[in-house]
Amino acid sequence: MSQEKQVFSIDLAGRQLTIETGQLAKQANGAVLVRYGDTAVLSTATASKEAKDVDFFPLTVNYEERLYAVGKIPGGFIKREGRPSEKAILASRLIDRPIRPLFADGFRNEVQVVSIVMSVDQDCSSEMAAMLGSSLALSISDIPFEGPIAGATVGRIDGEFIINPTVEQQEKSDIHLVVAGTKDAINMVEAGADQVPEETMLEAIMFGHEEIKRLIAFQEEIVQAVGKEKMEVKLYEVDAELEKAVREMAEKDMHTAIQVHEKHAREDAINEVKQRVIAHYEEQEVEAEVLGQVSEILYKIVKEEVRRLITVEKIRPDGRKSDEIRPLASEVGILPRTHGSGLFTRGQTQALSICTLGALGDVQILDGLGVEESKRFMHHYNFPSFSVGETRPMRGPGRREIGHGALGERALEPVIPSEKDFPYTVRLVSEVLESNGSTSQASICGSTLAMMDAGVPLKAPVAGIAMGLVKSGEHYTILTDIQGMEDHLGDMDFKVAGTAKGVTALQMDIKIDGLSREILEEALQQAKVGRMHILDHMLSVIAEPRKELSEYAPKIITMTINPDKIRDVIGPSGKQINKIIEETGVKIDIEQDGTVFISSIDQQMNEKAKKIIEDIVREVQVGEIYLGKVKRIEKFGAFVELFSGKDGLVHISELALERVGKVEDVVKIGDEISVKVIEIDKQGRVNLSRKVLLKEEQEKEVAKEEATQE
């Protein structure tokens, strides 16, 4: 590759996309600076010179955020970026998924792809720039990569598809789709949608693929100009004679073991065959490398046999038909003190989801590169080791758990009621208790049940299902509700979530070169049938959201005040609002438009806090009459509390009809007296009169007597 700086440009969705090579990170195998609008991402690709002694392809993809990209200094004491944000982890997965299938089988050199976000223009996606940059860094390098690939985001406004929508357009769009692939086929889809029909989603995917073809042609021009010659690598291969011997020893027994229906019994049967073959070679005292090859051949036999059974004999490992869903079972309300809970079981996959309702002050604060500052709906996914009968250290969530949590969040968000209709923060936690495939979709179903149990007025219930594909030449079989073995050994993992009306989320990963439109269309329609079956089951357990919230959930009341009065409610240094909170035990959240949310488990305390706030913001009007309490007495008059937080002065001359020598002769502290507002001066001080009311009363009496005499 030339070491001189070279620049290549193309128009992308009305904004200029520029690629710079030969200036930055020249010691990497491949490096490009992608400029899209004012977004700038440096993408690099490096590889080890020798293959690693592992039985998998060691690829690492990192999407690194830098807060200087949006002119921010990190918070906290250390003042530097720490662990990756959730958004950065999701972006890393987004880039990893389309490039991973495009490395040759048997390639074991360690490869690292790093994209550093250096400048962010919110209207020009840094994730799409990083995906393009990652593909191009690999393509121009000497690393053997069977790309390039490209990605595009697709939105839809008023029925019209848009490529790479701006922030403003995204707010109006009912589809948020990321599609990636090669020039020939799609190999990755990630989407959220507002109950959009399957046919529309398919059209959006195809629309995005047309833009991908254009971006790949652009990359091919750059590779032609600056690309390096690919390095010679030795792909890992097993010994042909050894493979023949192992197959003769294991194939027949493996065929029988694979068809054991129950997961653990099947695993035990397969392991028994494996252990018998490995023991045979251990007795011969062969080298560790040979034993490693034996294990790989056995894995290959299992994979081939599972795929042959599905495509040729139309038999699934657990005996189901291709479109058959495992037995379903669900319950709600199984945890008495939580706000809502739902248990969803599909075969040997089980998820327990818990819904917690909080005040709006419980929103998640986001401090990243995006425009979003907070989040009032969250879905978290946990996958403990006991769910698959294993032991391993209990650590924080990994990339997979964060990805599955985000998928569930995206699937459910379109049906969450607006803040105006339901002023709560909603947090869902899905605990995977058993796993045999499709746990992310089970968590979506469990979360829907939990929210309905909690009384969240969902726009519609959501269910999810995972589809699979096994393709051999021109023959293929689409599988509904894939289990773990079918996911691991198949060619596609296609997750579809939605309501009866349409799709709310899609996630597709392909292990082969890509998929045609026909297969995608068939998979979407088969998924719809499965989704409707699951929805019918869920609605038989709980037909609609509960009318009442849990007694343990906070009750929220909403009121509106004059925005100019917000400072009065808060008080100097928060003194006033903290006093209300201390007195009532409620939570108070105030919006800039004057909307006030008061929340507490105790509704009486909510009402008490509301009354205090109403008194604070209440406007005193000249001419109004109040029954007030004498709070303080001075020589010149008495201070009377009209309502909470508002006092006025009755001057000594306004206390009585006759001349008053001493204030205490008329009123004492604690007395309740009727007063009339006669003036509010320029400083906001309220002047009151008791004398005016006494005079009015006297005049009424005189008028009454005169009327009687007549």
Swiss-Prot record:
* GO MF, one example: RNA binding
| Cofactor requirement | Mg(2+)
Which Pfam families does the record match to this protein?
Answer: KH_1, PNPase, RNase_PH, RNase_PH_C, S1
GO annotation terms (biological process): mRNA catabolic process; RNA processing
Q: What is its main location?
A: cytoplasm
Q: Under which name does UniProt file this protein?
A: Polyribonucleotide nucleotidyltransferase
Enzyme Commission (EC) number: 2.7.7.8
The subcellular localization recorded is: Cytoplasm
What are its GO cellular component terms? cytosol
Reactions catalysed according to its record: RNA(n+1) + phosphate = RNA(n) + a ribonucleoside 5'-diphosphate
Q: KH domain location, by residue?
A: 554-613
InterPro entries assigned: ExoRNase_PH_dom1, ExoRNase_PH_dom2, ExoRNase_PH_dom2_sf, KH_dom, KH_dom_type_1, KH_dom_type_1_sf, NA-bd_OB-fold, PNPase
> Where on the tree of life does the source sit, at the highest rank?
Bacteria
**Keyword Nucleotidyltransferase among UniProt keywords:** yes
Give every S1 motif domain span. Answer: 623-691
Q: Which organism is it from?
A: Bacillus cytotoxicus (strain DSM 22905 / CIP 110041 / 391-98 / NVH 391-98)
What residues bind Mg(2+), as annotated? 487, 493
Its function, per the record, reads: Involved in mRNA degradation. Catalyzes the phosphorolysis of single-stranded polyribonucleotides processively in the 3'- to 5'-direction.
Q: Which family does it belong to?
A: Belongs to the polyribonucleotide nucleotidyltransferase family.
Which keywords, in A-to-Z order, does the entry hold?
Cytoplasm, Magnesium, Metal-binding, Nucleotidyltransferase, RNA-binding, Transferase
Keyword presence, Flavoprotein: no
Enzyme type, top EC level:
transferase
